[in-house]
A protein has these predicted regions:
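Exposed beta-sheet edge/beta-hairpin loop segments within beta-rich domains
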Residues: 115-140, 147-158
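A short linear-motif detector with a strong N-terminal bias
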Residues: 17-21, 72-74, 122, 139-146
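Beta-strand elements of well-folded, non-transmembrane domains
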Residues: 43-47, 146-148, 166
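Short acidic, glycine/tyrosine-flanked loop/strand segments centered on an H-E-D-like triad
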Residues: 101-122
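Short edge-strand/loop segments of extracellular domains
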Residues: 160-166
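OB-fold ssDNA-binding interfaces and closely related basic DNA-contact patches used
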Residues: 1-105
Length: 166
């Protein structure tokens, strides 16, 4: 474990976005037995400027904070899971977020989690199964936490943790 002090995480919500490959009802277990929920939000560039600025500022502040705490140490910067892309000839801001579905805490107790789901009016979805038909192209908003991290073997970056989807 390292002894760095991290800057505070941010809780953010995207503007209206097109959801790409949402796995929000059942966790994706293809690459890990614990599974994880995930979604990629594709936001038109003109609507994403404020969100992009906030994420970029957090990323730069995190790198500056680590450098200030250890001026002689070199930090490998991990490519963030957000950025601008050209999709079908249109500039878009994409953001990929995920959440672990289950695991074990430090005391050995099992835990499980799932993202909160809300309908278009903001009311919680009571029957998740009714959303099973949701797939790429669905329009929604994604709430997430942007958390700075540093692992010496991996590097420094920002992880985006899924919290809720409307």
């Amino acid at each position: 474990m390292n002894n760095f002090q991290y800057i505070d995480k941010l809780r953010l919500t995207t503007p209206k976005a097109t959801l790409k490959y949402p796995k929000l009802i059942e966790p994706e277990t293809k690459f890990s037995p614990e599974g994880h929920y995930k979604v990629t939000a594709v936001i038109p560039a003109e609507d994403a400027a404020e969100l992009a600025d906030q994420l970029d500022a957090l990323y730069e502040a995190h790198k500056a904070s680590l450098k200030a705490q250890a001026p002689t140490q070199k930090f490998k910067a991990i490519e963030p899971s957000f950025g601008y892309e050209d999709i079908n000839g249109k500039p878009c801001f994409t953001i990929s977020v995920k959440m672990k579905a289950k695991g074990m805490d430090r005391d050995g107790r099992a835990w499980s989690a799932s993202p909160a789901l809300f309908d278009a009016t903001g009311a919680p979805v009571k029957h998740r199964e009714t959303l099973r038909g949701m797939w790429s192209g669905t329009t929604g908003r994604v709430s997430f936490e942007a958390c700075p991290f540093f692992q010496p073997a991996i590097g420094a970056g920002i992880t985006l943790r899924l919290k809720a989807v409307q």
